[in-house]
């Protein structure tokens, strides 16, 4: 299992639509980069200048929206994940 460090979060991407509302199948090159994902694991939190640790606002299982070009894509045990900082998360869905 991936365990992120500090204020980082591991997410599993929610796949982009394969076809448009009118039924046109989109090739991979035409798909938008996904901006939604499910939080799989969270780090221990951000450390302030005084040494105090601040817990992250998201938790495993949360569905989130994140910045379009944020994070680092990794493949672990055949599954694609994205590791990003909490500051790149824009919203929690629901």
UniProtKB/Swiss-Prot annotation:
<dbReference type="InterPro" id="IPR037124">
    <property type="entry name" value="Chaperonin_GroES_sf"/>
</dbReference>
<dbReference type="InterPro" id="IPR018369">
    <property type="entry name" value="Chaprnonin_Cpn10_CS"/>
</dbReference>
<comment type="function">
    <text>Together with the chaperonin GroEL, plays an essential role in assisting protein folding. The GroEL-GroES system forms a nano-cage that allows encapsulation of the non-native substrate proteins and provides a physical environment optimized to promote and accelerate protein folding. GroES binds to the apical surface of the GroEL ring, thereby capping the opening of the GroEL channel.</text>
</comment>
<keyword id="KW-0143">Chaperone</keyword>
<comment type="subunit">
    <text>Heptamer of 7 subunits arranged in a ring. Interacts with the chaperonin GroEL.</text>
</comment>
<keyword id="KW-0346">Stress response</keyword>
<dbReference type="GO" id="GO:0046872">
    <property type="term" value="F:metal ion binding"/>
</dbReference>
<comment type="similarity">
    <text>Belongs to the GroES chaperonin family.</text>
</comment>
<dbReference type="GO" id="GO:0051085">
    <property type="term" value="P:chaperone cofactor-dependent protein refolding"/>
</dbReference>
<dbReference type="InterPro" id="IPR011032">
    <property type="entry name" value="GroES-like_sf"/>
</dbReference>
<dbReference type="GO" id="GO:0005737">
    <property type="term" value="C:cytoplasm"/>
</dbReference>
<dbReference type="InterPro" id="IPR020818">
    <property type="entry name" value="Chaperonin_GroES"/>
</dbReference>
<dbReference type="GO" id="GO:0051082">
    <property type="term" value="F:unfolded protein binding"/>
</dbReference>
<protein>
    <recommendedName>
        <fullName>Co-chaperonin GroES</fullName>
    </recommendedName>
</protein>
<dbReference type="GO" id="GO:0005524">
    <property type="term" value="F:ATP binding"/>
</dbReference>
<keyword id="KW-0963">Cytoplasm</keyword>
<dbReference type="GO" id="GO:0051087">
    <property type="term" value="F:protein-folding chaperone binding"/>
</dbReference>
<dbReference type="GO" id="GO:0044183">
    <property type="term" value="F:protein folding chaperone"/>
</dbReference>
<dbReference type="Pfam" id="PF00166">
    <property type="entry name" value="Cpn10"/>
</dbReference>
